[in-house]
Design a protein with these regions (language model features):
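Sec/Tat signal peptide C-region and signal peptidase I cleavage site
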Residues: 16-20
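Generic short alpha-helical hydrophobic face used as a protein-protein interaction/packing hotspot
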Residues: 14-15, 111
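Extended interaction-bearing regions that mediate binding to partners or small molecules
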Residues: 21-118
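Sec-dependent N-terminal signal peptides
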Residues: 5-14
Length: 118
């Protein structure tokens, strides 16, 4: 079952509190992401982006779905002493002729180590 891009980004950053916040936004996308796409993006953000230097960029791709993209740490800042980050996401697909889609989300780290969209 394919999921809309924004749901993917939620899972990516996400953790449960962020997903609850994001689902109400109703943003549309021409690219459908699979559960495996979401898992790949989440792993890349967690392992290669969160907590790294500003400008860090990581790529991802899924040969099964034909979807791919990049993730870039745009900015680091703090809110009430909590570390926060602005992360840019570029999503694309090989399945249809469509332009890459760009998103930026801000998230802050919670005391338990998880990240929440802010």
């Amino acid at each position: 079952m394919a999921l809309k891009v924004m749901v993917l980004i939620v899972a990516l950053i996400a953790w449960l509190p962020a997903e609850a916040q994001f689902l109400g936004l109703g943003l549309e996308s021409n690219i459908e992401l699979t559960k495996n796409d979401l898992a790949i993006i989440h792993r890349i953000v967690d392992e290669q982006v969160h907590g790294k230097a500003v400008g860090t960029t990581a790529s991802w791709s899924n040969s099964e779905s034909g979807n791919y993209g990049s993730i870039k740490l745009i900015k680091k800042y703090s809110v009430n002493g909590r570390p926060c980050e602005s992360i840019g996401y570029t999503l694309a697909t090989r399945k249809m002729s469509t332009s890459p889609e760009h998103y930026m989300l801000n998230s802050c780290q919670l005391p338990d180590g998880s990240w929440r969209i802010s």
